[in-house]
Regions:
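N-terminal secretory signal peptides that target proteins for export/translocation
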Residues: 1-15
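Active-site and substrate-binding clefts of carbohydrate-active enzymes
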Residues: 36-94, 117, 243-278, 282-309, ...
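Sec/Tat signal peptide C-region and signal peptidase I cleavage site
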Residues: 30-34
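Short, solvent-exposed turn/loop segments enriched in Gly/Ser/Thr/Pro and often Arg
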Residues: 113-118, 164, 200-210, 230, ...
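Bacterial N-terminal signal peptides
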Residues: 16-29
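N-terminal catalytic cores of secreted or lumenal carbohydrate-active enzymes
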Residues: 35-175
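CE4/NodB-like, metal-dependent polysaccharide N-deacetylase domain
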Residues: 178-206, 293-295, 326-342
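Acidic, His- and aromatic-enriched active-site or binding-groove loops in soluble protein domains
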Residues: 130-153, 158-159, 195, 218-286
Length: 490
């Protein structure tokens, strides 16, 4: 029998309101440990290296934004990218402005993933005083200020979570490349944010996740990662797949090891897809585990589901509490839901003045007024630790945002199969730009790893900046190889 799906509609508003009112009454009778729905944000900031060839000015490294703009090297309009009024503020002060309006909410905050390539680009513009000083030499100071603000539990209100330095599609890259991406990001963050304490969290580019990443994440000291809620949902035994709604492959039955949930909250979003998530199960943190098939050794981390449907709606227009109200009656106060709005922080409406200066504070205060709890992921996990036996399976895949992919477990937006001249799949004889790119990267990775085995491991600060004295050929090779894995070129 198909699982019941709840669609938001005007006709259900009265029922939802009644259910919500009942929930509030019930919550009032619960002991003090009972908790409401929590909310938080992840703002993702990224721009690539637009001209990853060797620098004309400096010879050894790739070009960063100031040189690329000055020499007009890229086919992209890099000047306009960085001269956008909103991006000038996104990369300097909008997050601080938004969080500065939430100081009366004791635990309210956000996470930001600021890719290393973007740090290098903005630093190049700030140091050069580009375009009349659009970016300050200390452009990072407002971020540092906000990272110094703390919740009631003493945790950062703005948590700079780790992200792959060059925004790779992590499940598709070699494990060694994946770890070097994380290590490069860890190398550039302290000098940028002025704090020796690295975040415990990880945001995967395009939210592309696979449990195969878990051993590398754990080895790099990462305790939790953000994942798409839909890939916990699709791994449930009774996921209500519908090709016209999902717009991607059906789940593999071998992936559907999560218990049947019986109820899925459905949202049809303007991206052209319907997300269906079991609540509360699909909107609260769990653990995910990878078992090495060769050794049987299990490694686990906490996975924090991002609310894909709600994130899309929250990022593209004024957003109230209606979608929280619709699911509030299903919250488990002992294991409360964490509704995480995770999306780009520098594109579309979600990167603009109204979003940061109006919507964040309006929503957060409206949510608090209704009894919901704005928080940060670190604060939530401290207040509501995930049990060691609370383990879910997370299906491979990314967020629903990528056009033509919609969370495909094959990552087809970056991994389109080989086709012939008629567009039919032809693996032995066909062509696909992405697949040929991966072939080149695989060969290059093999050469760099072989060189590393001969010459020794790199110093990551010199991989990030190979103009430093003592930089080796292996470090220069890693510098350029990592840039070649940028998702925007795939």
């Amino acid at each position: 029998m198909r699982s019941p799906i709840h669609h938001v509609s005007p006709g259900s508003a009265a029922a939802s309101a009644a259910a919500f009112a009942f929930t509030l009454v019930a919550l009032a009778a619960l002991p003090a440990a009972a908790a409401p729905i929590h909310t938080s944000y992840l703002w993702h900031m990224h721009q690539p290296i637009y001209w990853p060839d060797r620098s004309t000015w400096y010879g050894v490294p790739y070009e960063t934004a100031y040189e690329t703009i000055t020499l007009d090297h890229s086919q992209s309009d890099v000047f306009t990218v960085f001269n956008s009024d909103d991006r000038v503020h996104d990369y300097q002060d909008y997050p601080k402005t938004a969080l500065g309006m939430l100081g009366d909410l004791p635990d309210a905050g956000a996470q930001v993933s600021f890719a290393g390539s973007l740090i290098q680009n903005v630093t190049s513009l700030g140091n050069a005083g580009w375009n009349g000083g659009r970016y300050a030499a200390n452009w990072y100071q407002p971020y540092r200020d906000a990272m110094g603000w703390t919740t009631s539990g003493g945790r950062r209100r703005l948590d700079p979570v780790i992200v792959g330095f060059h925004h790779p599609i992590n499940p598709l890259v070699d494990d060694a490349v994946f770890r070097r991406m994380i290590q490069a990001q860890k190398a550039i963050m302290p000098g940028t944010w002025g704090s020796p304490t690295l975040s415990n969290g990880f945001f995967p580019a395009e939210m592309c996740f696979s449990e195969r990443m878990i051993p590398a994440l754990a080895a790099e000291g990462i305790q939790w990662a953000i994942v798409p809620d839909i890939h916990i949902a699709r791994a449930c035994a009774d996921y209500p797949y519908n090709a016209n709604q999902d717009n991607c492959d059906p789940p593999n039955p071998a992936d559907q090891s999560n218990p049947a949930q019986g109820y899925f909250y459905a949202q049809s979003i303007s991206r052209g897809v319907t997300t269906k998530v079991p609540v509360p199960y699909g909107l609260r943190p769990h653990r995910a585990r990878y078992v090495d098939p060769g050794t049987g050794v299990a490694t686990s981390i906490v996975v924090v589901p991002a609310a894909n449907g709600m994130s899309w709606n929250e990022g593209y227009g004024s957003y109230g509490t209606g979608e929280l109200d619709a699911i509030a009656s299903r919250n488990d106060p002992a294991k409360p839901m964490l509704v995480l709005f995770a999306h780009d922080g520098d594109n579309a409406w979600q990167g603009g003045y109204s979003y940061y200066n109006e919507n964040v504070t309006q929503f957060s205060h409206a949510a608090a007024a209704k009894g919901y709890e704005p928080t940060t992921i670190e604060e939530y996990l401290a207040d509501h630790p995930v049990a060691s036996d609370d383990v879910v399976h997370v299906e491979d895949g990314g967020w629903v945002n990528a056009d033509g992919d919609f969370g495909s477990p094959q990552f087809i937006n970056w991994n389109w199969p080989l086709v012939n001249g008629s567009g039919q799949f032809d693996i032995p004889n066909g062509w696909a730009e992405d697949e040929r790119n991966w072939a080149v990267l695989t060969a290059a990775t093999n050469r760099v790893l072989t060189a590393e085995q001969i010459a020794g491991a790199p110093v990551m600060s010199r991989v990030v900046d190979p103009t430093q004295s003592g930089t080796t050929a292996v470090e220069r090779a890693w510098h350029h190889l990592l840039a070649g894995h940028e998702s925007g070129t795939m």
